[in-house]
């Protein structure tokens, strides 16, 4: 079993790196504001038709464009969900959503979280899924990538005030990266058996002779961008464990690759744009080491079996409860780590049914900010915050002003870095405390004791870090939970983007200093270890008390 797990992880990472390298080169061209071959004419026509100016923006203008687009998208999606019974492509005549569920869902998809307090096949029309959720899957992913584009430019430009043009970046990212790759993935899913139609739900007679209603819909087109954009919201309630979304072992492997593809490519692009590919490889090494260790822990925990069943004398050599039986415990464990290391949240196994340690690792990966590959754009700019913190700590140890890529890291950058890093832990801990202090929060818990607290902690961690997966034992479709999680999702997304853009605005105006004998190399194994240690230290100091009350207490009981 250990050899199979190692082979699975190694194969996954090898294929991922092979696919991400050329995509990274394409992204580097976009960051450097070089149009891709054959796209100049199309861009000129589109920019003219849309009235888009290619004039560069400072960080405040860039940020305003990103925020304005997302707030407008939130309002449109909110009212679309409220009035979906008036809109077309609703063959099941599904009613509009309640205000709190519509708000939660709109915030969820605009922030790239895709937390779902509803069952897709019984709640949303085809129009809402297509024109509402799928559109936001593209826009939220493009917004995250645009932010990291601006931050990378801040490190590589000198004595400037501009970071590019947000509208140009958003259009290029959507047209030349997300749309074509998602189209290829969608066509592959259709070929493998995923649904893509507009038929009404089909009544069929099962083998036992009973009647069953099978949901239909344009699934493959949403499934592709759901994974590629690290969105994660399923067309159906079972998410990627539903055979209409994820029909074969091959589509399952492609889904995992799609989740990590752009985050990995962005690391390659960063090294290329910075003029030192070792910088990108350093980030990939740090992410990969944490990823492999976490995957190994989850696989080991699930292969050991369920201790509670063993105590009752039942055969539980492997914990298959809640796992995707088509793919097995190892693939289910790998998928769980992939989806929580990134900000995806799609699932093929019920994380609530994992063992205490097996469920703690995905929760912890979210709590550290999903910086292990992470979401499209958000993962890399989250990791860059830890890079700045690691550089600052190293500067304190050697008594020099910290610098990264020749840019000196001053008090302003460190204050903004600390603010950005503290946003999500504050939301998680305060949100979990509020839920446990109120009847409305506690009443949603299915299980008592440590596991019940783990359900609450996981939900708030997922929302604040824009993941969207859940310990499904929590009944979250209530006004209290819909509003609490909507607040966590919104602040967790834009409360980090705002200081990141402010950091970019500060760095882009600085000159790059040549490296000296006292400069800390940021591309070698020493800095990789320092960066990993910084991530682990911040995660340990922040969340060990909360984890001790939940999964650790459950494991020891």
From Swiss-Prot:
Localization terms from the record: Cell inner membrane
NCBIfam families named in the record: kdpA
Subunit structure: The system is composed of three essential subunits: KdpA, KdpB and KdpC.
Keywords: Cell inner membrane, Cell membrane, Ion transport, Membrane, Potassium, Potassium transport, Transmembrane, Transmembrane helix, Transport
Membrane-spanning ranges: 5-25, 63-83, 132-152, 170-190, 253-273, 283-303, 329-349, 356-376, 379-399, 416-436, 484-504, 526-546
Job description of the protein: Part of the high-affinity ATP-driven potassium transport (or Kdp) system, which catalyzes the hydrolysis of ATP coupled with the electrogenic transport of potassium into the cytoplasm. This subunit binds the periplasmic potassium ions and delivers the ions to the membrane domain of KdpB through an intramembrane tunnel.
InterPro entries assigned to the protein according to its UniProt record, in alphabetical order: KdpA
Bilayer topology term: Multi-pass membrane protein
Protein name (record): Potassium-transporting ATPase potassium-binding subunit
Membrane recorded as keyword: yes
Source organism: Escherichia coli O6:H1 (strain CFT073 / ATCC 700928 / UPEC)
GO molecular function, one term: P-type potassium transmembrane transporter activity
GO cellular component: plasma membrane
Family recorded in the similarity comment: Belongs to the KdpA family.
